[in-house]
């Protein structure tokens, strides 16, 4: 979500026109919706994981997140964009808890702290690299390419997880 974050206010302002105060309020509401749905799914994904394998959920959540990013770009108005951000938050909220659980259970107990540390470090680096990349992509090719490239990353992740699911 952080990769799209820096361009979201600009994209919404372009979509709406209008004064900065209204845009800021709407952006805040949309970010809240995405965050709330992400928290909701993160807290409840364990129930789903009791019925469906974690790799399968990761594949589906990654693919759905990719589709949702494309749909966000295609939304004709700001409130449908907000709705799609909510759906994206929901699918995205499943990914980190499951990925961390799979990582933690795949390594011996004595290496678990190190692996979780690396995972957290890379996630935090992504929180920096994502916005930098999206800003550069938006500057070079426009806002639409940020949505498409983010979707591509999630599709790629879904493919990698699918190919490696037997060893997960």
Where are these regions (language model features)?
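Structural signature of the two symmetry-related core transmembrane helices
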Residues: 56-71, 148-151
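Helix-breaking motifs and short loop linkers at transmembrane-helix boundaries and internal kinks
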Residues: 74-76
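Intracellular juxtamembrane helix-capping segments at the cytosolic ends
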Residues: 94-107
